[in-house]
From Swiss-Prot:
Enzyme class: transferase
Listed InterPro entries: RsmH, SAM-dep_MeTrfase_MraW_recog, SAM-dependent_MTases_sf
GO BP annotations listed: rRNA base methylation
Pfam families the record matches: Methyltransf_5
Region (Disordered): 297-318
Function: Specifically methylates the N4 position of cytidine in position 1402 (C1402) of 16S rRNA.
UniProt protein name: Ribosomal RNA small subunit methyltransferase H
Cytoplasm listed as a keyword: yes
Entry EC no(s): 2.1.1.199
Gene3D superfamilies the record matches: Putative methyltransferase TM0872, insert domain (1.10.150.170), Vaccinia Virus protein VP39 (3.40.50.150)
Extent of the signal sequence: none
Gene assigned in the entry: rsmH
GO MF assignments: rRNA (cytosine-N4-)-methyltransferase activity
Length: 332
């Protein structure tokens, strides 16, 4: 079935689109089109227009029917959402009324064995959301033991990362690791899960997937881009699924919504005027009914903010974690 043929309701979809408050004549960016859930909900507002972005060619192909149905109201672009400012400019939209993002891998991608995202199915060890750049198999084959340990620890939050990296290096000296099952079996030998705990390979797969797709760097850059394209009163809604993503979103919005500074002990420090106003102090989470229907919703957090009239802040430096280019360049 094509993604566009489903009536998929994304996690916290009504809540996220509710924060956007779409209106007739408004232009909205769906930075992570996927199966088109957010886009469909936005298009329910008559007269609204959506610029939808996805780096996955499968999602783009699957959205063809929705594009045909929506006509001029929907433009679907294959690109990274970090490039959303350039995408909007190319579509004649210097500013937009709202941006929504759903961070991380989609259920559609996880369920396709040939994409290599999940240890639940045996398939090629790929994990790329697009079809360009090194695959997870390339990283596993070429990264040094130290780099592998850092990738799995930083992006997968796996406390046994050094044990996993050592096991991978030992195994690849005997035979290439090219399938999801092969990698999951290697990890399961050194990470012992207790009954009721997540699969022992969960964090290793997460770390490699985030690294291969440069997901956290992409998120940093996409947030900066959204800040630049949102018009005053425009709204940003971001759904994240684990602590690494949520921490980035929370920090970004907190820093850009700060007012004042200083105290009776320290002088006030000049700082840029707030570029966002938070729509809620705490993240919005899924209710019991949604979690029962979709267990993936359990970890979801939605944060939203409204753009002020202040200029966009200067883009921050990316954290100094391992990069795909540097690891592959240094690889054996």
């Amino acid at each position: 079935m094509k993604p566009s043929d489903t009536r998929h309701i994304p996690v916290l979809g009504p809540e996220a689109v509710g924060l956007l408050a779409p209106r007739a004549g408004g232009i909205y960016v769906d930075g992570t089109f996927g199966a088109g859930g957010y886009t469909r909900l936005i298009l329910e507002t008559a007269g609204s227009r959506v610029i939808a972005i996805d780096r996955d060619p499968t999602a783009i192909a699957g959205g063809a029917d929705l594009v045909a149905d929506a006509g001029h109201r929907l433009t679907l672009v294959q690109d990274r959402f970090s490039n959303l400012a350039d995408v909007c400019a190319a579509q004649g939209a210097a500013t937009v009324d709202g941006v929504v993002m759903d961070i991380g891998v989609s259920s559609m991608q996880l369920d396709q064995a040939e994409r290599g995202f999940s240890f639940r199915f045996d398939g090629p060890l790929d994990m790329r959301m697009g079809r360009d750049g090194p695959s997870a198999a390339d990283v596993v084959a070429r990264a040094s033991e130290t780099d592998l340990a850092n990738i799995i620890y930083i992006f997968g939050e796996e406390r046994y990362s050094r044990h996993v990296a050592r096991a991978i290096v030992a195994a690849r000296s005997d035979a290439p690791i090219t399938t999801t099952k092969a990698l999951a079996d290697i990890v399961a030998k050194v990470v012992r899960a207790k009954p009721g705990e997540i699969h022992p390979a969960t964090r290793t797969f997460q770390g490699l997937r985030i690294f291969v797709n440069e997901e956290l760097d992409e998120l940093h850059q996409a947030l900066d881009a959204a800040e630049r394209v949102l018009k005053p009163g425009g709204r940003l809604a971001v759904v994240s699924f684990h602590s690494l993503e949520d921490r980035i979103v929370k920090t970004f919005l907190t820093e850009r919504s700060k007012t004042g500074g200083g105290s009776r002990h320290l002088p006030e420090v000049a700082q840029a005027a707030p570029s966002f106003t938070l729509l809620s102090k705490r993240p919005i989470v899924a209710g019991d009914a949604e979690v029962a229907a979709n267990p993936r919703a359990r970890s979801a957090k939605l944060r939203g903010a409204e753009r002020t009239e202040a200029p966009a802040h200067a883009a921050g430096d990316l954290p100094g974690w391992p990069t795909l280019a540097s690891v592959m360049r240094a690889g054996r």
